[in-house]
Amino acid sequence: MAASTMALSSPAFAGKAVKLSPAASEVLGSGRVTMRKTVAKPKGPSGSPWYGSDRVKYLGPFSGESPSYLTGEFPGDYGWDTAGLSADPETFARNRELEVIHSRWAMLGALGCVFPELLARNGVKFGEAVWFKAGSQIFSDGGLDYLGNPSLVHAQSILAIWATQVILMGAVEGYRVAGNGPLGEAEDLLYPGGSFDPLGLATDPEAFAELKVKELKNGRLAMFSMFGFFVQAIVTGKGPIENLADHLADPVNNNAWAFATNFVPGK
């Protein structure tokens, strides 16, 4: 039977197109007709600038045409994939999962790098407030006290800390991948909701869709921030807050360009 498209008039399908193709519509020997309906997936909240074909693109009005597989259905899709990393649907799904998980870890990590140093500069005592130096306290004579309190966790073995981290983080990731754990089962492994949404932020679908975009935007910034913190630690040997204070005090001599020239051959 030739492929055809018809609009159903019933309220349940009003305004939706139903496609009949040779593979989905066949006249059987008994004279019965078998049909399969195909309804397009929702593109996101109506009127949102972050979803759909008219969404915000990576270069705004100067953006070229987006690849056909980037339809604006998912949060954070700005229509840019020069390397074709999202062309395969399974790879795309896996990369989306990895990006969201790494974004969340990066946001926590960036906060952990900055906050102790801010507290230390405002009079709160730490054994070591700089993030990349804190772990080395475990090799000191007194070991490492979490939050400076020996009654919480008094660590003196790097192997014990490593094993504890593997067990705890492995358990959390195992529960996430399996979709079940002490807090119940989750249908969506990236956005489980339920006990993980005690404030009910995801109850409104349109607000939830906007929050997904905000999470990815902040997560991507956090991943770049963590990369910058690593580079700063290697080049200056200082934490991010101290580097910022040095730059504000003397921006001419304390900036990325000034430090980059230190690595020029022959200098």
UniProtKB/Swiss-Prot annotation:
Entry binding sites for chlorophyll a 2: 102
Positions where N2-acetylarginine occurs in the chain: 36
Cofactor note: Binds at least 14 chlorophylls (8 Chl-a and 6 Chl-b) and carotenoids such as lutein and neoxanthin.
Transit peptide: 1-35
Residues that coordinate or bind chlorophyll b 3: 157, 173
Binding annotation for chlorophyll a 1: 80, 86, 99, 220
Membrane topology summary: Multi-pass membrane protein
Binding positions (chlorophyll b 4): 165, 176
Subunit comment: The LHC complex consists of chlorophyll a-b binding proteins.
Family as reported in the entry's similarity comment: Belongs to the light-harvesting chlorophyll a/b-binding (LHC) protein family.
Domain remark text: The N-terminus of the protein extends into the stroma where it is involved with adhesion of granal membranes and post-translational modifications; both are believed to mediate the distribution of excitation energy between photosystems I and II.
Protein name: Chlorophyll a-b binding protein 1, chloroplastic
Organism: Arabidopsis thaliana (Mouse-ear cress)
